[in-house]
Regions:
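Predominantly extracellular beta-rich ligand-binding scaffolds that present long acidic/polar faces
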Residues: 154-332
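Extracellular and secretory-pathway beta-repeat/beta-biased strand scaffolds
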Residues: 1-203, 209-218, 258
Length: 332
C-alpha cells in the first residue's frame, strides 16, 4: 500500500544502458489524493525497462500514467482517474487474465476503466493490436500509434467515443488503421481519426435509420457506418450522387455490411450504392446479395468512379446487369 495525501506518486527506474533495464511492479494498492482530486497524479515509468501492472491505482479525479519500453497490464488491475495514459513501444490488447505477458494490456481492464468514468489513451511508438473485443458505454478511448492500428476484434461503443491516431512516428507516411473486424457505433457516439500531421477528422456516425438521408443531404461529408444494414423490399433505391451532383466525401464502413440492396433502373446511367464518385474515398464495407440493374456505368458499390477516387478493403456479392461499363464492384 502506497498513499500520498499530497496528491502525487512517481515510481520510476532509469537504466544507463540495455544491460541495466529497470522493472516497475504494481500488484498492491497505490493511492494519491489531493484536496480537490483534480491534481491527483500517479506515474509508473520504467525507463527502457518493464512496467508490470496487476493491482489498484487510484488517482480519483486526476491522472494516471503507466509507461515502459515493455508494459504489461492484466485484467486484475483497477484504475481510477479522470485520464489514464498507457505508453509502451508496442501494445497488444488481449484477454490478459492474471498472467503478465510482453507488451499486453487486458481488454477487460480497459472497458471497466472507461465505464467507471476514466478516459483511456493507449499510446505506442510502433503498432497497436486490438486482439480482444472491447465494449464500453461512456468516455473516450484513444488509440495513438506511431505506425499502424490493427483492429482484429470488434470494438463496441454504445456511449462516449473512439479516437484513432496513427502514423505519428516522425516521417511515417504509410501508417494506417486497419479494420479486420467491426467497429460498432451507436448514434450519438463520436468517431475521430488523425493521420500523422494531418488535421483531425470528426466523422458523422450513420446507421440504418439515417444512412441515406444524411449522405444524400451532404455529399462532401465524412461518414462512418456504425452498424450492419439490411434493406428489405426496396427496389427504388436512388444512387447517392449523380453526374451533376457527385459524391466527393469519405465513407468508411468500419467492417460492416449492407445487405439486399436492390436497384431496378434499366434505362438509367450511373447506378450503384453510390452513383457518381468524384475524388471520393470508400473503404471497409461489404455489399451482400445486391441486385443492381442500370444502363451504363453500373456497379454494386459505385457506378462511375473518377478523379482519383479510392476504394479499399471492400467487396460485393450479388447480380449486376446493364448494357455498357458494368462491373461487380465498380462499373467504370
Amino acid at each position: 500500500l502506497i498513499v500520498a495525501n499530497g496528491g502525487q506518486i512517481y515510481l520510476t527506474t532509469n537504466a544507463k544502458d540495455e544491460l541495466l533495464k529497470g522493472v516497475v511492479n504494481n500488484s498492491g494498492i497505490i493511492e494519491a489524493s489531493s484536496l480537490d482530486d483534480i491534481n491527483s497524479e500517479v506515474i509508473l515509468f520504467a525507463h527502457g525497462g518493464t512496467a508490470n501492472i496487476d493491482g489498484t491505482i487510484n488517482a480519483k479525479g486526476g491522472f494516471v500514467e503507466t509507461s515502459g519500453k515493455n508494459l504489461n497490464v492484466t485484467n486484475n488491475s483497477k484504475i481510477q482517474a479522470k485520464k489514464w495514459l498507457i505508453d509502451p513501444v508496442n501494445v497488444t490488447i488481449d484477454n490478459s487474465n492474471g498472467t503478465v505477458g510482453s507488451e499486453k494490456v487486458g481488454a477487460s481492464v480497459i472497458q471497466t476503466t472507461l465505464n467507471n468514468g476514466t478516459n483511456v489513451t493507449i499510446q505506442a511508438d510502433n503498432d497497436i493490436n486490438v486482439n480482444e473485443t472491447i465494449s464500453y458505454n461512456q468516455n473516450e478511448l484513444t488509440l495513438n500509434a506511431g505506425n499502424n492500428i490493427n483492429i482484429n476484434k470488434d470494438i463496441n461503443v454504445t456511449g462516449g467515443g473512439l479516437s484513432l491516431v496513427y502514423a505519428q512516428a516522425s516521417g511515417n507516411t504509410t501508417g494506417d488503421y486497419k479494420v479486420n473486424a467491426k467497429v460498432n457505433l451507436e448514434n450519438g457516439t463520436t468517431f475521430k481519426t488523425k493521420k500523422g500531421t494531418d488535421g483531425e477528422i470528426n466523422w458523422t456516425v450513420v446507421t440504418a435509420n439515417d444512412f441515406y438521408t444524411t449522405l444524400n443531404a451532404n455529399k462532401s461529408g465524412n461518414y462512418v457506418l456504425g452498424k450492419d444494414i439490411t434493406l428489405s423490399g426496396t427496389n427504388n433505391w436512388t444512387a447517392i450522387g449523380d453526374s451533376s451532383n457527385n459524391f466527393t466525401g469519405k465513407f468508411d464502413g468500419l467492417g460492416h455490411t449492407i445487405s439486399n440492396l436492390t436497384i431496378d433502373k434499366s434505362g438509367s446511367d450511373y447506378q450503384g450504392l453510390f452513383g457518381f464518385f468524384f475524388g471520393a474515398t470508400i473503404k471497409n464495407i461489404g455489399l451482400e446479395n445486391a441486385t443492381i440493374t442500370g444502363e451504363s456505368g453500373v456497379g454494386a458499390l459505385v457506378g462511375y468512379n473518377t478523379n482519383n477516387s479510392t476504394i479499399s478493403n471492400s467487396y460485393a456479392s450479388g447480380t449486376v446487369s446493364g448494357n455498357d461499363y458494368v462491373g461487380g464492384l465498380v462499373g467504370l
